Every structure is written in C-alpha cells, then in structure tokens.
Amino acid sequence: MLTVCWFLYLVRTADNALYTGITTDVGRRFLEHQTGKGAKALRGKGELSLAFSAPVGERSLALKMEYRIKQLTKRQKERLVAGDGSFEALYESLQTPPVKRD
C-alpha cells in the first residue's frame, strides 16, 4: 500500500497574518489559495506568500500539528517560521507516546 506524505504549511497574507493548513501537495494547495480556490479565510487577503512548509508524515499527525500550531500566538508562529527549533520540538512531542500513569 502506498503511503501518502502530508505537509504542514503556513501562508502569509498581505497584512502579515499567518494561515496554517495541511496538504499532500504544497505547490498545488498554495496555487489554489492564490487563485481563490482554497480556504475562504484567505480570499481577498491580497498577495500571499508561502512562509513555511515541512513534511510531517501521516494525516493524523498533520491534523494534530495543525491544531497545535493554530493555538500558538502570532509571536510563536513567527519563531516557528524563522526556524528556531519550535517546529521540531512540537513534532517530537506529538511523536512520543503519552506516558502511562498508574
């Protein structure tokens, strides 16, 4: 069975807001956003740029990461985009199985 790799990405709008999403094809999805066929949240937001993308593996992990990143503050998202290691730390924290407590 063929395993599809999912990616997490952040798009920057003209007013410097960051939109977070997941996809199996970053180039295709970004083009959809640029042509108004993507998320409604990005329609009419002016020029868009791809600020960040990274492979995360399975869809379930991509969904968890998307949720966690959407909970971050703008400052925390900017640090993630800048490559401060927070993406890797988040990725690792979601990869580690929860500790079983007695």
UniProtKB/Swiss-Prot annotation:
Signal peptide location: none
Domain GIY-YIG: from-to ranges: 4-79
Pfam families: GIY-YIG (PF01541)
The family this protein is said to belong to: Belongs to the UPF0213 family.
PANTHER family: UPF0213 PROTEIN YHBQ
Record protein name field: UPF0213 protein Ent638_3592
Originating organism: Enterobacter sp. (strain 638)
